[in-house]
């Protein structure tokens, strides 16, 4: 294809051979009349299945950038954005299932001027005790809180379904490579858009199904720990961002969170124990145990940021 795309979709992908087919199918099924777009998939570490899939993709204007070794999400995002040719730059993580009007809606959202546009996730869970006891309810609370947020703090929801114009990319620059592991590279970017004077807003019509990876307490707690560590980096870089206090105030519940966060127990190990108990505990008790595991893991990661060592 030789046309200049209106939009570029940047897809960072790590071990995504099982996720990419549904994403590519969804992008290939965009409505007739969709503005021309390209897809740039950055394979973060050689993944033979992903590479073969992309080499055989003929329905889309798709390009692949392949890192020989895993370099992390920030490096993948920056490589994809730098290679993009479109004016509207869409970050679309490889576990999303875009609707048939996805590209058109992202493009349309920028017609009134440059800004940052966020579509929240519609998380889809496999059938696990964690999802039924905690995950689905937590998602509802998250979405409710997001839509009730003041415009000045919407940047906090910048994540894996968002778009900017080339003007913003050139003004704000790359994702910050100091976020080498999991989490907060996206929040950091949303904040920088906001601080550059551009509006960041939520677009309800861009809510997109998301095949969520954190389907157990063990996975969720492990990610919470890494996210807590990354938050510490964000606060060091942006001390005036006005985030709520990461260390909770004093209450019986918060005393439990504080105490558990100090115990040298790997979050995933604690999470696995909770997952086993969820099968037999009353729902309310199970919900509290999951919350305690997740909140204490996040606080533990925040207090000991150097303990985070994994990439996702």
Label each region the model flagged.
Residues 67-84:
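Glycine-rich, basic loop-to-helix element that forms the pyrophosphate-binding segment
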Residues 225-226, 243-312:
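Non-catalytic, C-terminal membrane-associated alpha-helical segments of glycosyltransferases
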Residues 136-154:
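Short, flexible, basic/aromatic active-site loop/helix in glycosyltransferases
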Residues 101-133:
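Conserved donor NDP-sugar-binding/catalytic core segment of glycosyltransferases
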Residues 89:
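Short aromatic/hydrophobic "clamp" motif used to bind/position activated sugar donors
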Residues 25-36:
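Short, acidic, metal-binding catalytic loop of nucleotide-sugar glycosyltransferases
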Residues 161-164, 168-173, 179-206:
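A short, conserved alpha-helix in the catalytic core of glycosyltransferases
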Residues 26, 43-52, 69, 93-97:
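A conserved acidic beta->alpha catalytic loop
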């Amino acid at each position: 294809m030789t046309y200049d795309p209106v939009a570029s979709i940047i897809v960072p992908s790590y071990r995504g051979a099982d996720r990419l087919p549904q994403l590519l199918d969804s992008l290939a099924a965009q409505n007739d009349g969709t503005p021309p777009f390209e897809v740039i998939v950055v394979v973060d570490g050689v993944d033979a299945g992903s590479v073969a899939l992309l080499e055989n993709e003929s329905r889309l204007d798709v390009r692949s950038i392949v890192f020989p070794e895993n370099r992390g999400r920030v490096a993948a995002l920056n490589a994809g954005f730098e290679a993009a040719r479109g004016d509207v730059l869409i970050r679309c993580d490889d576990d999303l299932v875009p609707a048939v009007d996805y590209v058109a809606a992202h493009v349309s959202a920028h017609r009134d001027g440059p800004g940052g546009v966020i579509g929240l996730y519609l998380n889809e869970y496999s059938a696990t005790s964690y999802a039924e006891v905690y995950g689905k309810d937590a998602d509802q609370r998250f979405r409710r809180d997001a839509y009730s947020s003041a415009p000045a703090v919407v940047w906090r929801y910048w994540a894996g379904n968002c778009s900017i114009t080339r003007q913003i990319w050139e003004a704000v620059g790359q994702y910050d490579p100091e976020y080498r592991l999991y989490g907060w590279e996206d929040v950091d970017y949303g904040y920088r858009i906001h601080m550059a004077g551009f509006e960041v807003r939520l677009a309800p019509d861009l809510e997109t199904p998301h095949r969520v990876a954190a389907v157990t307490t063990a996975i969720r707690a492990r990610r919470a720990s890494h996210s807590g560590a990354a938050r510490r980096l964000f606060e060091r870089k942006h001390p005036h961002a006005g985030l709520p206090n990461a260390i909770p105030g004093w209450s019986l519940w918060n005393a439990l969170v504080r105490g558990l966060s100090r115990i040298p127990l790997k979050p995933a190990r604690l999470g696995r124990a909770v997952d086993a108990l969820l099968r037999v505990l009353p729902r309310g008790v199970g919900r509290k145990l999951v919350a305690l595991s997740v909140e204490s893991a996040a606080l533990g990661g925040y207090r000991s940021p150097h303990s985070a060592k994994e990439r996702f």
